[in-house]
Amino acid sequence: MTHRDREGAGGLVRVPGMRIMVSADMEGATGVTWTDDVVPGSPQWDRFRRLFTGDVNAVLAGLCEAGASDVLVNEAHSSQRNLLLEDLDPRARMLTGRHKPLSMMQGVDSGVDGVVFLGYHAGAGFDGVLSHTYLENQITGVWLDDVPASEGRLNAAMAAEYGVPVLLVSGDDKTCDDARDYSPEAELVQVKECVSRYAAICLPPARTAELLTGAAADSMARAGREERQVGTHRIEVEFDASHLAQATAVIPTVEQIGTRRVGFDAPNMTEAMKCFKVVTAIAAGAVQGIYG
């Protein structure tokens, strides 16, 4: 169920003293398949935030078992206030709440030795459980340097800018397929198999916990700073309606390049993602009722 199918892993190799960050999203968590599972306030959300917290704790167990001395969990879904702090493994710290300068990747610039993408999902325009990129429906596609980009690909590019390797990615099978391309050395944990955007064949929490803990421990063999990959980047965003492209093109660095498409260049990935966040915020604010 992981990229290396957990074969031939041998004995556990401890890597002491490593600082790790976990970027935790919810759509790719154990059992999640439906909108109400991840929308704050619904009865289903209250149930699945516990499963989400369980996934995080399973990863924390593996990271700490393999020698991680400091783990920061960046809560990265929606309001970014979904994980249950009172149930979190006490060996971790949690960054919770919105309006973080680096959003899902807040903390990657603090000298960490590796990052885990937990509960991730496929990008807008692709098959996958609850697939999207930042906005649930308004964005139909994102491209990073002419390559279709999920949140995982965008975040991996930011991690590379700080010399931080992606150690592990978890989610459905489509998420794992995506990660094989943008982070081929990462451990992968498939917690469910996509049937449609709103249906999946799911493994029970006891099984996913075992997989997540084992893969997290194995992933620590790759922990350690790498050479920073800094350079210019271009992001293009396609929307489901023309007025969203018009609205976001008011940003000085953003150009409307098609009826529903905008693009912009940035000197580095950090600045690219800051601009992308502004694009998504303006687009979300321009949605008008059932017409979008």
Each language-model region and where it sits:
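C-terminal accessory domains and tails appended to enzymatic cores
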Residues: 208-292
